[in-house]
């Protein structure tokens, strides 16, 4: 798995598209920005936001 990284703005949205694919994702900016932009997150954290 990829190492945890900081993902903000469009990078974060792009990562969600990659991880979630056709399932789509629930974009809750407050939660995910706190988890993935302010702090590094990994692919498993991102999967929690998939539909």
UniProtKB/Swiss-Prot annotation:
Q: Which SUPFAM superfamilies match?
A: Insulin-like (SSF56994)
- Please give the Gene Ontology molecular function terms for this protein: hormone activity
The record's CDD domains line, in alphabetical order, gives: IlGF_insulin_like
Localization annotation: Secreted
Coiled-coil annotation reads none
Superkingdom of origin organism: Eukaryota
Protein's GO biological process: glucose metabolic process
Asked if Secreted is a keyword of the record, the answer is yes
Its GO CC terms? extracellular space
Keyword Secreted applies = yes
Q: Which cysteines are joined by disulfide bonds?
A: 8-37, 20-50, 36-41
Q: How does it assemble?
A: Heterodimer of a B chain and an A chain linked by two disulfide bonds.
Role of this protein: Insulin decreases blood glucose concentration. It increases cell permeability to monosaccharides, amino acids and fatty acids. It accelerates glycolysis, the pentose phosphate cycle, and glycogen synthesis in liver.
The family classification in the record reads: Belongs to the insulin family.
The protein's name is Insulin-2
Q: Which organism is it from?
A: Katsuwonus pelamis
Q: Which classification does the entry list for the species? A: Eukaryota, Metazoa, Chordata, Craniata, Vertebrata
């Amino acid at each position: 798995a990829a190492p945890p990284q900081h993902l903000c703005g469009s990078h974060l949205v792009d990562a969600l598209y990659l991880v979630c694919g056709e399932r789509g994702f629930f974009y809750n900016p407050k939660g995910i920005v706190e988890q993935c932009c302010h702090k590094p997150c990994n692919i498993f954290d991102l999967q929690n936001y998939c539909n």
